[in-house]
């Protein structure tokens, strides 16, 4: 990312210049504040049993997620002890990061244009993963699709969850917003 004061991420400019007007026309909004926009993107890597056996796995996941997001990831810990899984309270189990503003648009741009085309046998993402309130959740089987991760230096292949929160009131509005960003839905 550039540190220039007048720098605007590509997708943010596209949203401002074309997507807002298209959505306003499509759904007939009377007020500009009704137009859906991206609120935040949450990335999560859960290490599960790997972190229970080796506490360094959660640190590795945190480092990888920090590289992918461009922002320091926080470690997620167990809320309570579960003896059957050998999990103790406050034991590190993964990492998560919340992206907002310019970093959010930069990440979405890299996800759509670079990471998704690198997924093996990729035929688009499901259009059914909306929560009913305009938010979209998806999962990746491996984090190696991001160019920030050096294939030779990783010790574990992590899957990750990506949640895209929008201000849309319905799933149709959110899907239309994400399609305008060229999100490759298969349905």
UniProtKB/Swiss-Prot annotation:
Q: Which InterPro entries match?
A: Ribosomal_uL5 (IPR002132), Ribosomal_uL5_bac-type (IPR020930), Ribosomal_uL5_C (IPR031309), Ribosomal_uL5_CS (IPR020929), Ribosomal_uL5_dom_sf (IPR022803), Ribosomal_uL5_N (IPR031310)
Q: Does the keyword Nucleotide-binding apply?
A: no
Q: Which GO terms describe its cellular component?
A: ribonucleoprotein complex; ribosome
**Subunit comment for this entry?**
Part of the 50S ribosomal subunit; part of the 5S rRNA/L5/L18/L25 subcomplex. Contacts the 5S rRNA and the P site tRNA. Forms a bridge to the 30S subunit in the 70S ribosome.
SUPFAM superfamilies this protein is in? RL5-like
GO BP terms in the entry: translation
Protein name as annotated: Large ribosomal subunit protein uL5
Record keywords: Ribonucleoprotein, Ribosomal protein, RNA-binding, rRNA-binding, tRNA-binding
Q: Name one Pfam family in it.
A: Ribosomal_L5
| UniProt family annotation | Belongs to the universal ribosomal protein uL5 family.
Q: Keyword Aminoacyl-tRNA synthetase, does the record have it?
A: no
In the UniProt record, what gene is named as encoding this protein?
Answer: rplE
Q: What does this protein do?
A: This is one of the proteins that bind and probably mediate the attachment of the 5S RNA into the large ribosomal subunit, where it forms part of the central protuberance. In the 70S ribosome it contacts protein S13 of the 30S subunit (bridge B1b), connecting the 2 subunits; this bridge is implicated in subunit movement. Contacts the P site tRNA; the 5S rRNA and some of its associated proteins might help stabilize positioning of ribosome-bound tRNAs.
Family annotation (HAMAP family): Ribosomal_uL5_B (MF_01333_B)
Q: Which GO terms describe its molecular function?
A: rRNA binding; structural constituent of ribosome; tRNA binding
